[in-house]
C-alpha cells in the first residue's frame, strides 16, 4: 500500500508553512480528514491497520482516540476490530473524558490517532485512560511523521518522541518531514507566517 500516494491523490498532502498541534512548524501537513472523508477508503486503510495489529497478537478490549483528528480513524479501526470506541477531548485546553464514556478497571485500550507526530495528544489520552483504571497496551495511527518508533516498520525513535518506549506503535507508513521550533524555523526566517491547519480552509 502506497500511503504517500493515497494522501496525494486525496489532496491531503499539503505544502506551505504550518503550525502543528505540537507547537512545531513544518513545510508539510497531512490533512487526514481528506482521506477519511471517503468511507470506503477509510475502511480499507483501517482494515489493513487492524490486520497489522492482529498479527502481533495484541489483546485489547477498546479503542480510544483524542478528538478531533483521531476520531474518524479510531472509530473505523474499532469497527474493523469489532471493539468498543470512545474518545477524549480538550476542555479549557485540558484533555478529558466526557459524554458518559466510562473506563472499566483493567480494561485494555489501544490509543488511535490519524497522524502521530511527537505523540503528545495520544499520550494525554493514554494518561486519562490509566487514571480511570484502564490499561494502555499500544498505540496506532494511519501514519507516523517519523519521530516515534513504529513496531511493524522497525523505524527508530527520535529525540522529540513522547510515546512510552515500552509500548508498541502500529502505523501504515512513515512520513519523514522536518519540523522546527519557531526560533529556528527557516520558513519564519524568510518572512512567512505559520498557519494552523483548518484556520484558512486548509
UniProtKB/Swiss-Prot annotation:
It comes from the Bacteria. Orotate binds at residues 117, 145. CDD domains: PRTases_typeI. Pathway: Pyrimidine metabolism; UMP biosynthesis via de novo pathway; UMP from orotate: step 1/2. 5-phospho-alpha-D-ribose 1-diphosphate binds at residues 93, 113-121. Keywords: Glycosyltransferase, Magnesium, Pyrimidine biosynthesis, Transferase. GO terms for biological process: 'de novo' UMP biosynthetic process; pyrimidine nucleobase biosynthetic process. Its EC number is 2.4.2.10. Belongs to the purine/pyrimidine phosphoribosyltransferase family. PyrE subfamily. Homodimer. NCBIfam families: pyrE_Therm (TIGR01367). Catalyzes the transfer of a ribosyl phosphate group from 5-phosphoribose 1-diphosphate to orotate, leading to the formation of orotidine monophosphate (OMP). This is Orotate phosphoribosyltransferase. It comes from Campylobacter jejuni subsp. jejuni serotype O:23/36 (strain 81-176). The gene is pyrE.
